[in-house]
UniProtKB/Swiss-Prot annotation:
Residues 157-250 are annotated as: CTD. Coiled coil: none annotated. Belongs to the FKBP-type PPIase family. This is Long-type peptidyl-prolyl cis-trans isomerase. Keywords: Chaperone, Isomerase, Rotamase. The lineage of its organism: Archaea, Methanobacteriati, Methanobacteriota, Methanomada group, Methanobacteria. Its EC number is 5.2.1.8. Residues 85-136 are annotated as: IF. It comes from Methanothermobacter thermautotrophicus (strain ATCC 29096 / DSM 1053 / JCM 10044 / NBRC 100330 / Delta H). Homohexamer.
Length: 250
């Protein structure tokens, strides 16, 4: 079965800058370590909706027509990646603006100005030159890409969007329950996600993104409900069960 627009899939990839061969992103932990990248919290196949805006345009188009398990090497021009560089996005900002916020800018520093992320190029003469272009703007990229899985079950599609928008080391996706009935999706998240250090706003935004991708891409779904359930437990019985399991491993 070939991948089509609107499909839920899981992909693996390594992305490089064509000109230098520099690895800038990967789903493989070993590759990240070898490339000296900052280690992500979670590696492994990434779930996406094809055409859902989860990938850059060139990568989104590259997966269409691929089969499950198929691998491909693709080259993506700047206009289908992170765009061409725009000289207007390199700006001079008075040092006083930073001093008022208690910021000491230095070359290479990343910062956010009026909601836009930029990189400090240099600091000179009381002014700071900041580049608001994406760091990969203007670069041709290469990807080694693999379609790991084409997801067909609706409940698994829902779980894939949870993994995409709410990645968590605490979460066991198999302990997340999904029910779909009468046009409504009911999600019981793995209770361990409650221990994530996230703001209320971050949790709300993640849930909105999950819901949006579900109702836009799973036919018949009109409503998504997140259910927080707290159950009384027999803690003593659970501790004994864990002791038995630990003894069995010795």
């Amino acid at each position: 079965m070939a991948v089509n627009k609107g499909d839920f899939i899981k992909i693996e990839f390594t992305g490089k800058v064509k000109e230098t061969g520099e690895v800038f992103d990967t789903t493989y932990e070993e590759v990240a370590r070898e490339a000296g990248l900052g280690i992500k919290k979670i590696f492994g196949p990434i779930p996406v909706v094809v055409g859902g805006g989860h990938l850059i345009k060139g990568l989104d188009e590259a997966v269409i027509g691929m089969e499950e398990g198929e691998e491909k090497h693709v080259e993506i021009e700047p206009e289908d990646a992170f765009g061409n560089r725009d000289p207007k996005l390199v700006q001079l900002i008075p040092m006083g603006e930073f001093k008022r916020q208690g910021i000491k800018p230095y070359p290479g520093m990343t910062l956010t100005v009026e909601g836009h992320e930029g990189r400090v190029l240099n600091v000179s003469g009381g002014r700071v030159r900041v580049d608001f272009n994406h760091e990969l703007a203007g670069k041709t990229l290469e990807y080694d890409l693999k379609v790991k899985e084409i997801i067909t079950d609706d409940a698994e599609k829902v779980k894939s969007m949870i993994q995409l928008h709410y990645p968590s080391q605490n979460m066991d996706i198999d302990k997340t329950e999904v029910k779909i009935e009468d046009g409504k999706v009911i999600i019981h998240m793995d209770e361990m996600t409650r221990f994530d250090n996230r703001s209320y706003m971050d949790v709300t935004l993640a849930r909105f993104r999950i819901a949006r991708d579900i109702w836009e891409n799973i036919e018949g779904v009109e409503k998504v409900e997140f259910a927080d359930v707290f159950e009384k437990r027999d803690m003593e019985a659970e501790e004994k069960e864990e002791e038995v399991e630990d003894a069995g491993e010795d």
